[in-house]
Amino acid sequence: MKIKVISDLHVDINNNITWNFDPNTFYVICGDISGDVNTTLNFVKENINKGVFVAGNHLGYSGKVTLEDSLYMLRKEFSKGKVRFLNNHVYSIKDVVFIGTTLWTDFNLYGCVSECMEIAWQYLNDYRYVKTFNEKFGTITRIGPLTTLGYFRKNVEYLCNQLEKYKNKKVVIVTHHAPSLKSVDDKFVYDKTSAAYASNLEWIMEKYNNIVLWCHGHVHSKARYRVNNTRVICEPYGYYNENLMDIKDLGYEIDI
């Protein structure tokens, strides 16, 4: 099965681009199509004929609805048919099982969780713009590092449960956040904000030999490496001022 991996289109920022998606290609979009749920929804409907996609950390940046409502709207629209939104969901096609989740991070990339959480709180726009519904108090608040740490733990538990379930199948994991420090560009390897971009999940790839591909986004730099039997691919478009990619070459094609 041939697929094309892409991420970080940011179509709300890259709004002068005429996108060129092949209707016969199966696309795997690893998050951050847009910061607005309706823009994301309409873009996928108009451009993607078949494939899967996950949410990125930018979903909710528009501030119009909560993250929960955005995720609900996308899943409601893309839970059936040839294009699927995966938010802790599985999609099986041919002999391949796609497991998708945003992921988030555990802030433990450097062994100093509290410090990295504080840095993320200070510098990441996620914690300024994205809103969540606080069930305990019945109020709408901004997400915080503790919120996303909770998401991460839930999402990793889901991944492992599904990997146990499908351990005799060929699996592709689709996330937005990265599963290893190896995905981080050299100039950011010692930057502690990177703990909000990647986690050390190589142990998952070491444990499950049937993961043929783990594709992700978020870091805005390409990544190509292997952990055990798993190929890790990141193929971001990024922002208009950091990418000279020919739009005709959009996506990284791989045969799985």
Language-model features, listed with the residues they occupy:
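Active-site environment of divalent metal-dependent phosphoester hydrolases
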Residues: H10-N16, S34-T39, H58-V65, V90-S92, ...
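Active-site-proximal loop/helix segment associated with metal-binding centers of metalloenzymes
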Residues: I99-V172, P179-F188
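Binuclear metal-dependent phosphoesterase catalytic core
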Residues: N24, D185, K192-V212, V219-I256
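Active-site neighborhood of phospho(di)ester-bond hydrolases with catalytic His/Asp-centered motifs
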Residues: V5-S7, Y27-D32, G51-N57, R84-N88, ...
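A structural motif corresponding to the C-terminal end of an alpha-helix
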Residues: E77-V83, Y158-K170, W203-W214
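N-terminal active-site segment of His-dependent metallophosphoesterases
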Residues: M1-F53, H58-D69, P145
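A basic- and aromatic-enriched beta-loop-alpha substructure that forms the phosphate/nucleotide-
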Residues: K50-R128
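Beta-strand-turn-beta hairpins that frame and shape the catalytic cleft
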Residues: M1-K4, V90-G100, K169-K170, R226-R231
